From Swiss-Prot:
Residues 188-244, 272-437 are annotated as: Disordered. GO terms for cellular component: cytoskeleton; cytosol; focal adhesion. The gene is Tns4. It comes from the Eukaryota. Residues 585-711 form the PTB domain. It comes from Rattus norvegicus. Residues 192-207, 306-316, 337-349, 367-393, 405-415 have a biased composition (Polar residues). Residues 1-14 form the signal peptide. Interacts (via SH2 domain) with Rho GTPase-activating protein DLC1 (via C-terminus); the interaction is independent of DLC1 tyrosine phosphorylation. Interacts with integrin ITGB1; the interaction displaces tensin TNS3 from the ITGB1 cytoplasmic tail and promotes ITGB1 stability. Interacts (via SH2 domain) with E3 ubiquitin-protein ligase CBL (phosphorylated on 'Tyr-781'); the interaction is enhanced in the presence of EGF and reduces interaction of CBL with EGFR. This is Tensin-4. The modification Phosphoserine is found at S230.
C-alpha cells in the first residue's frame, strides 16, 4: 500500500467475512448522539441517549475500543510497515465492530482528506455469496452507507427516493462492500446537509473507477440482494424503477416542516401528509422495527389507496400480511410532490418550487413524467361534465388524504373537505342572451345598429319610441354637449316623485337623459350613485340587467324602431323626412320680459324697448333654438342660465322680428333681434316675451320664425 494513501487520513480495511457480518448485523452504540439512525436488512430505528440499546458484545466493547485505538496509533507511527504488510497485518489484527470504529473516529484527529475510490485493492472484495451475486448483477453499482455523527437540525427531503438529512431512510438494505473510506472533506456540491458526517463507500471489485460524487450526498441505491429468510422481499422491477431518479439528480430539497428530526424517521403525520408517506418505499421499514411499531405510518387507509401497476412498476395487488409489510405504491399525487417541498402541517397541497428554496434545479435531471394511465385518468376527469359542475360549486382549500380515482370520489371529497361558496349563476353565452334574456356584451354590440342613432334629432328619437313598448330606448349624439350622448327612454308612466321637467313630453311617456363622456368613462348625469362605464355598450349592458338610476331597465331592440328603414339614421334621410316639421339654429338668448296680456308684434316691440331702457344690459347666452311640431325647445349650450326649456305649441302666441329693426351690438357684431310670445309659466293670466339675437349669419332666424308661424296657423285652423 503506497504511502500517499495515508497523507490526509487513515484507511482501515476489514476482513471480508467480518465486514459482511457487521454490515448485515450492525450494533448500535450508546455513545452516538440521540438521533443517529442505524439500519439493517431486518429493522430500522434510532438510538436515544436515555434508552441505549446494547447487543451481546457490549461487554467487550471497551476492550475492543482500546485495542482499536492502540492499533491505530501503531499504524500512525509505522507507515512504512503498514505499506509493506498491510494486507496480512490488517486481516489478522483488526477485529472490532462498526460501533467501536465510530468511537475511534470520534477520538482521532478529524482532519480527513477525500481519497479516490479507486485505491481500494482486490482485498476489498467481499467473499460471501450475497455480495458475489450482487457484483455479477450490477458490476458498476456503488454502495453508499451514510451515518450521521453530530447533527444539529433536521433537513429532510420530500422525495420518496432521496434524503440528505441525518435521518436517512435506506430503501432496501445496508451496503455490502469491502473497503471503507473515511472522509470529512467533501466537495461543496456533494456535501450533505450536515457538516459533520461520515460516508462509507465501497468499490465492488474494481481496481480503479471514476469518482461519483452525486451519489455521496443524495441517495442510497436500492439493491435487490437479500439474505434468505429475510422478512422483506423486494418486488421485481422495483429496483430499476427507483434507481434512475435516485442517481440522476444532485438537488436536495429542504423540508418546510417545523417538526423535529425523529418525526421524519417515524413517519409523523405532522411532517408529511398521508399521500406523501405512502410514496416512500415500504420495505425500508419492517414490522419488527421500532419505527414501524411506534407509528406504523399512522395506519393509512388501505381501501383508499389507488394501486396502479404502471406507476412504480410494482405488482398491482399490495401484500397485506402480518409477517410482511404492506407495500404501499406511490400515488400520482405523491409523485407530483417529489419535485417540491413537503406539504405543510395543514396538509395543504400548494407546492413550493425547488427554485425558491435551493436555487436553480439541476438541468440534467429529467422532468417527472406521468404514466399513460395517469394521463388518461387526468384527461377523463378534466373532460367529465360532472367533474366540472362539482368544481364550480365548491372551492376546496385542502385536498383529501385519499387519492381520487373517479368523479364520484371527487364529489365526496369536495363535500367533506371544502368550504362551500354560494351558488353563482353561470355566465351566459356570448353568442346570444340567456334564457331570461339577460344580454351579454357581444349581444349588445351586435344590436347597436338598432339602438344607437348618432345623427338623429331629439324629435326623431321621440317619433321612433312613440309606438314602442316601455323600456325601449335610443341613444344619439347630444346637440348641446359635444362628445356626450342623449338617451331617450320610453317609460310605463311618469313617477309621481319625479315632476315633469321642461323638455319632457309627459303625454308620450318618453324621458330624456344625458350620458356624459369624460376621461373616467361614460356616466349618467345627475346620478351620483351611478358608476362610470368604459364604453357606451357597457353602459347599456349593465342597465339592461339593472335599472340603477333609470326609471326602468333597458330593453335592447332586435329590429328597427318604429318600423323605419335601416338607413333611417343617415343624415340626408333624417333631414329630408323632418324638414317640414323641425328647424333649428344657434342664437343669443337675451332676456325674458313680461308683457301682461299683449300678444303679436306689439308685445315683441314693447319687450325690446324695456330691455334697451335698462341701466345694465343683459349678458347674452348661446342657446340652441329648436322648433318642432310639439313646440320650441331651448338648450343652453354653456349651461350658464338654464339647462333646457320647452314651450309647448299650445302655449305659443306669436314669433317674429323687431318691428323697428333694432339690432343688438353688445359682445358681438350688430345682429337682428327677434322674439316669441308665450304663456307665462308663473302667471297664468299674463304673457311673456322671450328675446333673442342672431348668432351666426349662416344660421338666420327667418327659418325658425317661418316654421313657428306655420305651426301656429295650423293650430288656429283646428
Amino acid at each position: 500500500m503506497s504511502s500517499s494513501l495515508l497523507t490526509g487520513g487513515h484507511v482501515v480495511s476489514l476482513t471480508p467475512h467480518e465486514e459482511s457480518r457487521m454490515a448485515l448485523h450492525p450494533t448500535p452504540s450508546h455513545d452516538l448522539p440521540a438521533l443517529c439512525p442505524y439500519y439493517t436488512t431486518e429493522s430500522w430505528g434510532t438510538q436515544p441517549l436515555m434508552d441505549p440499546t446494547l447487543c451481546k458484545g457490549s461487554s467487550n466493547r471497551l476492550q475492543q475500543a482500546q485495542q482499536a485505538e492502540a492499533r491505530a496509533q501503531c499504524l500512525l507511527q509505522c507507515p512504512g510497515e503498514q505499506a509493506s504488510g498491510a494486507s496480512q497485518d490488517l486481516d489478522s489484527c483488526i477485529d472490532f465492530s462498526l460501533e467501536a470504529l465510530n468511537k475511534m473516529i470520534l477520538e482521532l484527529d478529524p482532519t480527513f482528506q477525500l481519497l479516490p475510490s479507486g485505491i481500494a485493492g482486490p482485498q476489498a472484495e467481499p467473499t460471501n455469496s450475497v455480495a458475489s451475486r450482487t457484483k455479477k448483477e450490477e458490476p458498476d453499482a456503488l454502495d453508499i452507507k451514510y451515518i450521521e455523527v453530530t447533527s444539529t437540525r433536521s433537513r429532510c427531503l420530500d422525495s420518496p427516493q432521496r434524503c440528505s438529512s441525518p435521518c436517512v431512510t435506506p430503501p432496501f438494505g445496508s451496503p455490502r462492500s469491502g473497503g471503507l473510506f473515511l472522509s470529512r472533506d467533501i466537495p461543496r456540491e456533494t456535501r450533505s446537509s450536515s457538516n459533520e458526517s461520515l460516508i462509507f463507500s465501497g468499490n465492488q471489485g474494481r481496481g480503479s473507477s471514476p469518482h461519483t460524487p452525486s451519489s455521496l450526498s443524495n441517495s442510497i441505491p436500492c439493491r435487490e440482494s437479500r439474505a434468505s429468510g429475510s422478512p422483506l422481499a423486494t418486488p421485481p422491477g422495483w429496483e430499476k424503477g427507483l434507481r434512475a431518479p435516485q442517481w440522476g439528480s444532485r438537488v436536495s430539497t429542504l423540508s418546510a416542516s417545523p417538526v423535529s428530526d425523529i418525526s421524519y424517521v417515524f413517519g409523523s403525520n405532522q411532517s408529511l401528509p398521508h399521500s406523501s408517506l405512502s410514496s416512500y418505499p415500504p420495505s425500508s421499514r419492517s414490522l419488527g422495527s421500532p419505527a414501524s411499531s411506534s407509528s406504523s405510518l399512522h395506519s393509512l387507509d388501505r381501501g383508499s389507496q389507488c394501486v396502479r401497476s404502471s406507476d412504480a412498476q410494482v405488482p398491482s395487488n399490495p401484500i397485506v400480511g402480518m409477517g410482511q409489510p404492506q407495500a404501499v405504491p406511490s400515488t400520482p399525487v405523491a409523485k407530483e410532490q417529489a419535485s417540491s417541498c413537503p406539504p405543510s402541517v395543514t396538509n395543504s397541497m400548494a407546492d413550493i418550487p425547488i427554485v425558491l428554496i435551493n436555487g436553480n434545479p439541476e438541468p440534467q435531471s429529467p422532468p417527472a413524467q406521468q404514466t399513460p394511465r395517469y394521463q388518461d385518468s387526468v384527461q377523463s376527469r378534466a373532460t367529465s361534465p360532472s367533474h366540472l359542475c362539482q368544481a364550480t360549486k365548491s372551492h376546496s382549500k385542502t385536498l383529501p388524504d385519499v387519492p381520487l380515482t373517479s368523479p364520484s370520489h371527487l364529489c365526496q371529497a369536495t363535500k367533506s373537505h371544502s368550504k362551500t361558496l354560494p351558488d353563482v349563476p353561470l355566465t351566459a353565452s356570448p353568442e346570444s342572451p340567456a334564457k331570461d334574456m339577460q344580454p351579454t356584451m357581444k349581444f349588445v354590440m351586435d344590436t347597436s345598429k338598432y339602438w344607437f342613432k348618432p345623427s338623429i334629432t331629439r324629435e326623431q328619437a321621440i317619433n321612433l319610441l312613440r309606438t314602442e313598448k316601455p323600456g325601449t330606448f335610443v341613444i344619439r349624439d347630444s346637440s348641446s354637449y359635444r362628445g356626450s350622448f342623449g338617451l331617450a327612454l320610453k317609460v310605463q308612466e311618469t313617477p309621481a316623485s319625479a315632476p315633469n321637467r321642461p323638455g319632457e313630453d309627459s303625454t308620450d311617456f318618453i324621458r330624456h337623459f344625458l350620458v356624459e363622456s369624460s376621461a373616467k368613462g361614460v356616466h349618467l348625469k345627475g346620478a351620483d350613485e351611478e358608476p362610470y362605464f368604459g364604453s357606451l355598450s357597457a353602459f347599456v349592458c349593465q342597465h339592461s340587467i339593472m335599472a340603477l338610476a333609470l326609471p326602468c331597465k333597458l330593453t335592447i331592440p332586435q329590429k328597427e324602431l318604429g318600423g323605419a328603414e335601416p338607413a333611417s339614421d343617415s343624415p340626408t334621410h333624417g333631414q329630408t323626412s323632418c324638414l317640414k316639421i323641425s328647424a333649428g339654429c344657434h342664437t343669443l338668448y337675451l332676456t325674458s320680459v313680461s308683457v301682461e296680456t299683449l300678444s303679436g308684434a306689439l308685445a315683441v316691440q314693447k319687450a325690446i324697448s324695456v330691455m334697451l331702457e335698462r341701466d345694465v344690459l343683459p349678458t347674452p347666452t348661446v342657446v340652441h333654438f329648436k322648433v318642432t311640431e310639439q313646440g320650441i325647445t331651448l338648450t343652453d349650450v354653456q349651461r350658464k342660465v338654464f339647462f333646457r326649456r320647452h314651450y309647448p305649441l299650445i302655449a305659443l302666441r306669436f314669433c317674429g322680428m323687431d318691428p323697428e329693426q333694432r339690432k343688438w351690438q353688445k359682445y358681438c357684431k350688430p345682429s337682428r333681434i327677434f322674439g316669441f310670445v308665450a304663456k307665462s309659466q308663473t302667471e297664468p293670466q299674463e304673457n311673456a316675451c322671450h328675446l333673442f339675437a342672431e348668432y351666426d349669419a349662416a344660421q338666420p332666424a327667418s327659418q325658425v320664425i317661418s316654421l313657428v308661424t306655420a305651426l301656429l296657423k295650423d293650430t288656429e285652423r283646428v
